[in-house]
Amino acid sequence: ALAVENRRIALEKEQATVHAQNEQLRANLLRTISHDLRTPLTSISGNASNLLSNAETLDAETRTKICTDIFDDAQWLIGLVENLLSITRIEDGRMNLQISPQLMDEVVEETLRHISRKSKEHIITTTYSDEILLADMDARLIMQVIINLVDNAIKYTQKGSRINISAYAKNSNIVVDVSDDGPGIPEQNKAQVFEMFFTGQNQIADSHRSLGLGLALCRTILAAHKGTLTLRDNEPHGCIFSFELPKSEVSIHE
């Protein structure tokens, strides 16, 4: 009877700990969202008000600049909402993965067509090995992983810097590396970059776009695929985010 009671107490303590962690996560999320969303929303509202009030007096170049700013802020907000929904659904077990064999090089190319216009300020290249890069995945979610990794590289590197996406086979996995030649990540921050809400100190990054959900989401999505996400240095400077997915056992000819 004592052993049963001890197990009951231990289970209650564990449940209380999980509940406290969930409440802390919810509090962090609400606090961070309410703080960090204010700037882009204020920017959208201010720019839209300017257009409504001064449309007839603004020259074409100024109107285009204002519309571009509104578009960029709106796109960032859309991406944020998609990340939040994906994290919530996966961690609640409500995300039904639509797994099928996909060619990784085709997924990468499709992803690049969805990358925001900011990618035009960087040099993005791709490298694929000669073998068939077939992996089992939910292509929509893996595209979201690649978008987040590339957006992260864009955010933390100078305009005009290089970002390379390479895909290749390694043993029983398909590997994708997203590398940049930026300043890299300090050693003391490497263990934290995958934590939700963590944002590194970087003068290049846009300070109001710093929820720190992207890498946490990437790792969550890849864990649901039985895959991994790692970080290493890109010599002489920069970093490489690398993820692996199991190879598909389906033949490309089937």
Language model: regions and residue ranges:
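Short alpha-helical segment of the dimerization/phosphotransfer core of two-component systems
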Residues: D72-L77
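Conserved catalytic submotifs in the C-terminal HATPase_c
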Residues: Q98-L103, T125-L133
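Short conserved segment of the HATPase_c
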Residues: I185-T199
